Amino acid sequence: MHLSPREKDKLLVAMAAMVARRRLERGVKLNYPESIALISDYVVEGARDGRSVAELMQAGATVLRREQVMEGIAEMIHEIQVEATFPDGTKLVTVHNPIR
């Protein structure tokens, strides 16, 4: 199987998001890369499901709460930008203040 660098990046994010979900299920607080991966995966999958950019910008900020991440992580992440493939093409989705 031959994957482009973009496809490899998508797989790495998806795998990191899976690890993050398992840790949340066990009650483990997420670190910076896990938090970014989980929110990014949510946006990418939402785009794949046909949700709008505006909807994902709002919904992306509801994926994680402060109490689910390690201390200081919410303050470190001011915005997350994700390039996602929508039915009408690839678009950049920006989630402002993603952990509230």
Swiss-Prot record:
GO cellular component terms given for this protein: cytoplasm
Instruction: Report the pathway entry.
Output: Nitrogen metabolism; urea degradation; CO(2) and NH(3) from urea (urease route): step 1/1
Q: What GO terms describe the biological role, i.e. biological process, of this protein?
A: urea catabolic process
Pfam families linked to this entry:
Urease_gamma (PF00547)
- The keyword Hydrolase is annotated on this UniProt entry: yes
Reactions catalysed, semicolon-separated, are:
urea + 2 H2O + H(+) = hydrogencarbonate + 2 NH4(+)
Q: Membrane-crossing residues?
A: none
InterPro entries recorded for this chain?
Answer: Urease_gamma, Urease_gamma/gamma-beta_su, Urease_gamma_sf, Urease_subunit
Q: Which SUPFAM superfamilies match?
A: Urease, gamma-subunit
Subunit field text: Heterotrimer of UreA (gamma), UreB (beta) and UreC (alpha) subunits. Three heterotrimers associate to form the active enzyme.
Protein family according to the UniProt entry: Belongs to the urease gamma subunit family.
PANTHER family, per the entry: UREASE (PTHR33569:SF1)
Protein name per Swiss-Prot or TrEMBL: Urease subunit gamma
Q: Which gene encodes it?
A: ureA
